[in-house]
């Protein structure tokens, strides 16, 4: 193959240049949702930290407990915690919600209002299962089937999935084909 003088390095490797361009455009134009699953409580239920790579804004899904582990991860990643998302109000998923919301001054989003009686019973649930005392809270926003929730520049669709609890919801990200399902 002949060398042509004056060509840019990428002209010698068109496939590399094309791939670099595609990935650079992807980073500039389209936000990507990232997540880390953190098992919490004696039940080791899946709490997830979600964040947008463009804004570094984060949400915590189902902070059932072990708040130091959750906030430690968020701090290490340099994320800005903006909200709590709840799939349902059982103690292992919602036990740390009131404390985290108060400490971080962030809103609580979800679940569906069908779980109001579970929220009201969180203090009793924590005693029954030997969890740290759970505070009572009122969500800033109840969720319904077809709603969307924003994490930074990323959107999650909401599906109401009663069964495990009357107000259980699921959060779905079509861009990463991942659902955050609680106990469904």
Per-segment meaning from a language model:
Residues 124-125, 148, 154-184:
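Metallo-beta-lactamase
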Residues 6, 65-149:
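Active-site HxH/HxHxD metal-binding segment of metal-dependent hydrolases
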Residues 21-24:
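Serine residues within intrinsically disordered or low-complexity segments
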Residues 3, 9-11:
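Short hydrophobic alpha-helical segments enriched in small aliphatic residues
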Residues 31-77, 170-184:
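Conserved beta-strand hairpin/beta-sheet module of binuclear metal-dependent hydrolase folds
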Residues 17-18:
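Tryptophan (W) side chains
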Residues 50, 62, 88, 100, ...:
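Divalent metal-coordination and catalytic microenvironments
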